[in-house]
């Protein structure tokens, strides 16, 4: 199902005239790979390890986008920014910072998913209620906080950066 949704998102973006995004292609490739592995192997381990695997690959894609000098957020930002700003240092800086915040969010989710997987795969915590509580916080609590912080930062940072530059340089952005 997730593979079909990832493919559908790519098709929908193209239908709407939007560019193909690295993150969407990467997600489709990972989901297709996980689907194939699940079909051809004993996939019982996937119940425990699927979330860390997906978060790990997402994290790798995001870090790779920065490493090659094309922060993944630029692909999304270009859809709402005029072409004349795409190559400016400010546009690159803003998107690099936003990408790093999203990397931090996904890294937190990855760690939370690892904690949950480790708890589910062994007798680390002997009290079932304590284990369930830790799993809930590591899974849902971390995910919600990480995503909210990343979304808020994404909405806040571009204007905050431009305002700071105006104050520092005494000019309009």
Model-derived features: positions:
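C-terminal ends of transmembrane helices
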Residues: 7-19, 154
